[in-house]
Regions:
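Glycine-rich, positively charged active-site loop/lid region within alpha/beta enzyme cores that binds
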Residues: 13-26, 101-157, 179
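Basic phosphate/pyrophosphate-binding loop/patch that engages nucleotide-derived ligands
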Residues: 45-46, 92-106
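Short, hinge-like loop/turn segments at secondary-structure boundaries
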Residues: 70-74, 97-99, 124-128
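Conserved small/polar residues in nucleotide/adenosyl-binding loops
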Residues: 183-187
Length: 187
């Protein structure tokens, strides 16, 4: 069996990859309804193939709908959300954190180091050859001037407490009451 089966992306149009604001599209009707998804996942749970379910890259609307349906229709409950969260991307705190805490649906954090920027590897204009930022153009949202200034301040703060930037960033993420796990990986 699979301990935790996570839905990777919502099918419906929503604000992905750091896009601010939601732009509604009346023609966006070709996605599987929330209830149908939960019913499909329930079959796998009933067959013993999956123990728990979660989702990734979800919004407050999506998480709320899943929770409401699981309560009202006796369907499986989402146990986790896997979204980005770090010192420079705290959008999870707007709407999602309250739901996570009140509904006991923990955050599995990805990008706790802002795709490596909070490790300090991009300080002073550095761009390591095989880094994520060098390999994947279009990820520059973590290297904008405002973020770069924040990284310098975090570097000073970490140094003041005899820590690396990565240790500071991970300690911050781990201190949040809605976080249950964080993922880091080398790049």
């Amino acid at each position: 069996y699979i301990d935790l089966y996570q839905l990777h992306w919502p099918e419906r149009n929503t604000n992905f990859f750091g896009k601010h604001g939601y732009e509604h599209d009346e023609n966006d009707k070709d996605w599987t309804p929330f209830e149908d998804i939960l019913e499909s996942l329930k079959r796998f749970i009933d067959q013993g193939k999956i123990r728990y379910i979660g989702m990734s890259n979800e919004t407050p609307y999506g998480l709320s709908r899943y929770i409401e349906l699981s309560k009202n229709k006796n369907l499986p409950r989402m146990m986790s959300v896997q979204n980005p969260y770090n010192l420079v991307n705290r959008t999870y705190e707007i709407g999602m954190s309250e739901i996570s805490i009140r509904e006991k649906c923990g955050l599995l954090v990805y990008y706790p180091l802002a795709t490596g920027a909070l490790s300090g590897k991009y300080r002073n204009g550095q761009m390591p050859k095989n880094s994520r930022q060098a390999l994947f153009k279009g990820w520059e949202r973590h290297l904008n001037p405002l973020a770069m200034n924040a990284y310098e301040e975090y570097h000073k703060l970490a140094k003041e407490y005899n820590m690396t930037m990565a240790q500071l960033a991970q300690a911050f993420v781990n201190s949040r009451p809605f976080v249950c796990l964080l993922y880091t990986s080398p790049s």
